[in-house]
């Protein structure tokens, strides 16, 4: 059935059901698999959130304390509501953690991962003051590109789909109408010529390569066509008998063994940006019309530059179907009006989907800010003749455009901001932890002598075998405090923003192992610092209002001590600021509720000791490796690189890949 072109919003809300193949309506339901039952505040939180969704309440907030099992609560809600779900996190690391957790909860359903696919990205820009043009430079991670394609293919073919995404989900993506229309189905018994299948594959940006198969490629041997879709790991083998599809099967890429036969397979495009040939010609005409209209508004130099560049791009598109920076012409290919919102991942969802915004106090501001940053960068490119004005429309959504998709929303945060509180029909608290652990005891002490007092508290903590965190206002203070503690025979290290993720992970591991006892830092709110060994947190200069000393930040920092049953937090301040008062009062309120619940149910909280993972091998020094051992080391590193990519630790995988390249050069030099 042909679907007429729609704007992104109209397409999502009116025509979605026409864009799906038959499997979509027969796909399985969500099935939550877990070895434990909801406990603490989880049962009532699940019940209230489900009730709110069934009553069609547009916004709800899950206010859950650290360690209360918010992800498990959300998984239970998804399991009961049974709608395709988008979970948005504010960074890749958190998105990867959530993706892995949801995969464990829903092993029989489709859990997908959608983040930016750039390992490295330098956007195109122009600096008028220096007359310096900076060309776009990017390195795409093929594994993440494959996972992005898998997310959209799953949304087109199934209902039991959870997509965990970063804010990349509001950036421009190919038209879902084209993505579906240009795909094609293969059925056993269909009458189709081999040439027709090959032409269709080429049309949707598959590459023929009879030597090396990888996602987005196909090979041909006689009447057998092997395809690896862009969102697949294994081979789809299509065997023809004359002009008839005789057999379709999934074949293990590594072993060549047939895994299963299938009656039907739908081949989606190998890229998100696919354009039918007739639309391509129409788009080129539209681009040239815009060029003619815009040239008179520019100076002589800018006009010449833009005309030369645009005509070259059009020639490339006509010859090859693409050009460098083709995304800047996306408005023309999508037949959108100037200023009209682009298609994005949200347009691949049905109208009635569930939206979870994790750590909403950080994610909502990110969603707000994306459009303005993109617009300001492109202004000089347009003003100085490097891009047509239509480049503005290759952009992320404005926040008000994003809000149109917010029909069934759950904000998740320990410290919701004003936006969440003002919009939510209900705020569901999850205060009681399944483990019985309570929020730490909080004290406020004078600033005078704060360093000496912190040192005394640290000594007590170290004597009982626990660790301490101390947060300062500046990097210089963190360094000075670390040196002071070291002079007083206390093993301390400091953490700051210059330290890379891998080093940071190793520092936290060494803290847990007891190689040092105190971690000093400025921003201790980042993920990965929920350490059960931490029995004391000292917050220096707590009455200096501002970043990291507002009530939300203080509550978050206090929560870092909530995984230890004997923990304590001390805020050093001479003035009881409004932020301190709110943080202390809220912590005491939660603590009282938790203690009362434990007494009523006879629960004695115990610190849960998480296993400490193995050390990340130091891979920066290769000088000690004997030349004869390098080939074996490369094999081991390659295996480790693939494992890192599988667990979505792409920073580690990139580091390993670069080391492998370095070692391969050494082998060639021998």
Swiss-Prot record:
The keyword S-adenosyl-L-methionine does not apply. This is UvrABC system protein B. The gene is uvrB. Gene3D superfamilies: P-loop containing nucleotide triphosphate hydrolases, UVR domain. ATP binds at residues 64-71. GO terms for molecular function: ATP binding; ATP hydrolysis activity; DNA binding; excinuclease ABC activity. Residues 453-612 form the Helicase C-terminal domain. Residues 631-666 form the UVR domain. GO terms for cellular component: cytoplasm; excinuclease repair complex. SMART domains: DEXDc, HELICc. It comes from Methanosarcina acetivorans (strain ATCC 35395 / DSM 2834 / JCM 12185 / C2A). It is found in: Cytoplasm. The keyword Ribosomal protein does not apply. The beta-hairpin motif is involved in DNA binding. CDD domains: DEXHc_UvrB, SF2_C_UvrB.
């Amino acid at each position: 059935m042909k679907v007429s072109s729609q704007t992104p919003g109209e397409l999502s809300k009116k025509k979605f059901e026409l864009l799906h193949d038959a499997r979509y309506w027969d796909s399985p339901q969500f099935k939550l698999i877990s070895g434990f039952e909801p406990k603490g505040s989880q049962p009532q939180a699940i019940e209230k959130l489900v009730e709110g969704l069934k009553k069609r309440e547009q916004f709800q907030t899950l206010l859950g304390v650290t360690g209360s099992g918010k992800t498990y609560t959300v998984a239970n809600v998804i399991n009961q509501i049974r709608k395709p779900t988008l979970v948005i996190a504010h960074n890749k690391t958190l998105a990867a953690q959530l993706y892995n957790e949801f995969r464990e909860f829903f092993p029989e359903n489709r859990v997908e991962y959608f983040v930016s696919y750039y390992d490295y990205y330098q956007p195109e820009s122009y600096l008028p003051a220096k007359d310096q043009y900076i060309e776009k430079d990017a390195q795409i991670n093929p594994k993440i590109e494959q996972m992005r394609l898998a997310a959209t293919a799953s949304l087109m073919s199934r209902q039991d789909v959870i997509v965990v995404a970063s804010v990349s989900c509001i950036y421009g993506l190919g038209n879902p109408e084209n993505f579906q229309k240009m795909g094609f189905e293969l059925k056993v018994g269909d009458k189709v010529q081999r040439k027709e299948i090959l032409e269709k594959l080429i049309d949707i940006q598959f590459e023929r390569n009879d030597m090396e198969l990888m996602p987005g490629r196909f090979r041909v041997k006689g009447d057998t066509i092997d395809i690896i879709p862009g969102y697949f790991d294994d081979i789809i083998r299509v065997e023809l008998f004359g002009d008839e599809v005789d057999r379709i099967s999934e074949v293990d890429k590594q072993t060549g063994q047939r895994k299963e036969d299938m009656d039907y397979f739908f081949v989606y495009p190998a890229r998100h940006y696919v354009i039918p040939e007739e639309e391509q010609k129409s788009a080129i005409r539209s681009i040239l019309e815009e060029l003619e209209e815009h040239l008179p508004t520019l100076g002589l130099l800018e006009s010449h530059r833009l005309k030369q560049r645009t005509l070259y791009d059009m020639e490339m598109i006509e010859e090859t179907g693409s050009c460098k920076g083709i995304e800047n012409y996306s408005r023309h290919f999508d037949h959108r009006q100037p200023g009209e919102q682009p298609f994005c991942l949200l347009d691949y969802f049905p109208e009635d989907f569930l939206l979870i915004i994790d750590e909403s106090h950080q994610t909502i501001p990110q969603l707000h800010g994306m459009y303005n940053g993109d617009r300001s960068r492109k202004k000089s490119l347009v003003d100085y003749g490097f891009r047509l004005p239509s480049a503005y429309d290759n952009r992320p959504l404005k926040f008000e455009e994003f809000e149109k998709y917010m029909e069934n929303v759950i904000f998740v945060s320990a410290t919701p901001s004003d936006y969440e509180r003002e919009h939510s029909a209900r705020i569901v608290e999850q205060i009681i932890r399944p483990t019985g652990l309570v929020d730490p005891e909080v004290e406020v002490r004078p600033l005078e002598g704060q360093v000496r007092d912190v040192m005394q508290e640290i000594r007590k903590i170290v004597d009982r075998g626990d660790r301490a965190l101390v947060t300062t206002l500046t990097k210089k203070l963190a360094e000075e405090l670390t040196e002071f503690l070291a002079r007083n025979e206390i093993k301390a290290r400091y953490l700051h923003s210059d330290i890379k993720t891998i080093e940071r992970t190793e520092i936290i591991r060494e803290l847990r192992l007891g190689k040092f006892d105190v971690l000093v830092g400025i921003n201790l709110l980042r993920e990965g610092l929920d350490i059960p060994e931490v029995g004391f947190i000292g917050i220096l200069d707590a009455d200096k209002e501002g970043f990291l000393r507002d009530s939300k930040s203080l509550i978050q920092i206090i929560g870092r001590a909530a995984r230890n049953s004997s923990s304590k937090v001390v805020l050093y301040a001479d003035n009881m600021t409004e932020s301190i008062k709110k943080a202390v009062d809220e912590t005491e309120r939660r603590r009282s509720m938790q203690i009362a619940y434990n007494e009523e149910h006879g629960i004695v909280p115990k610190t849960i000791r998480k296993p400490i993972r193995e050390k990340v091998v130091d891979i920066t020094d290769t000088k000690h490796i004997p030349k004869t051992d390098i080939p074996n080391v490369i094999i081991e590193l390659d295996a480790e690189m693939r494992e890192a990519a599988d667990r979505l630790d792409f920073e580690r995988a990139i580091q390993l890949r670069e080391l492998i390249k370095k070692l391969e050069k050494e082998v060639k030099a021998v």
